[in-house]
């Protein structure tokens, strides 16, 4: 991926770098009580679920990926999900607000390839930063992505523009990407900002009320509404 007219973004996320600056990175993802749709832009050599989730052991109750899942039984993780992947998104369920911290992680190569099947794919955004949807999806596959669902937000591909409450991909977030066929792509991060977009309108609640995020979500895009003949 290019990051300027003459330079390439290396696997460490450095514009014009030679890949030699990659040291282990430390970062944390802030989680609210309930289900959080996350991804990882760096994972340690030991990417087992027990190691990756060790900072919130006893607070995390389960992790759900696409077609895989694991539950914490009080002493061990059990289930079909055993290794965390930098290209996958995950629902992380916790019983209290906390920070999921990863130490000495290997930064994910920004040009990593995603192989998606037709339908819903639970994917990551593999870089610590933000890019708007249209810029982040290569032109040759953008038309094959009909919609994208995040945690409490969504965007619909209208052909000439994206509409909805989701406006950008953010590092650390997971996304359901809905495709009309099988595609292979890498995100275009040439216009990426290191400042994450926080303008999405997610779940809101009346005063003195709480909203608990569910892993089951539905979104509706309404083209026309007629009320009392208006």
Provide a role label for each language-model segment:
Residues 1-25:
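Extracellular calcium-associated, cysteine-rich motifs in secreted modular proteins
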Residues 24-219, 227-230:
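N-terminal exported-region signature
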Residues 222:
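Nucleic-acid-binding surface
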